[in-house]
């Protein structure tokens, strides 16, 4: 009976933690198994934090408005990730290994330096939202991806040299 009570309390606690956005890496690292949502926007990051591998339950990751230049080829450990916001960074390319993020539903690449998407992005089985506004691709490429990814809400526009 005690075990059952403990198990139910633990599940209730973990379920309650799913709605919490951690906004500080040190705080998140203090309890990595309870990190479901991590928001590190406007932190001046130049790269994906290597500590991401310590969050096995991570579902939502917001790295927007940083200076990240490269999308690592080694995010396959984030199998529970459903939401990834990389908008307003300096990412130049997306690796084919993005197809390993099989739970990904929402991908925001708005305002990056990407000039092409890997074909494998169309293999994400749960993707239903893709924002590639401001990505430098030809109109033909936009059409190709839109055709390959029917059922995905596509947000796209030509890039601009806008000043904030």
Q: Predicted segment positions?
A:
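Leucine-rich solenoid repeat scaffolds
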Residues: 113-164
């Amino acid at each position: 009976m005690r075990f059952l009570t403990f198990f139910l309390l633990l599940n209730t606690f973990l379920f309650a933690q799913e709605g919490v956005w951690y906004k500080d890496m040190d705080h998140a690292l203090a309890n990595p198994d309870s990190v479901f949502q991590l928001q590190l926007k406007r932190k001046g990051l130049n790269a994906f934090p290597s500590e991401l591998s310590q969050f096995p339950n991570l579902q939502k990751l917001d790295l927007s408005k940083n200076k990240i230049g490269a999308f690592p080829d080694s995010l396959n450990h984030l199998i529970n990730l459903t939401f990834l916001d990389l908008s307003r960074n300096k990412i130049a390319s997306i690796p084919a290994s993005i197809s390993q993020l099989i739970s990904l539903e929402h991908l925001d690449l708005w305002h990056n330096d990407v000039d092409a998407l890997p074909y494998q992005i169309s293999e994400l089985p749960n993707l239903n939202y893709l924002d590639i506004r401001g990505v430098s691709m030809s109109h033909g490429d936009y059409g190709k991806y839109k055709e390959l990814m029917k059922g995905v809400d596509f947000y796209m526009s030509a890039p601009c040299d806008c000043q904030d």
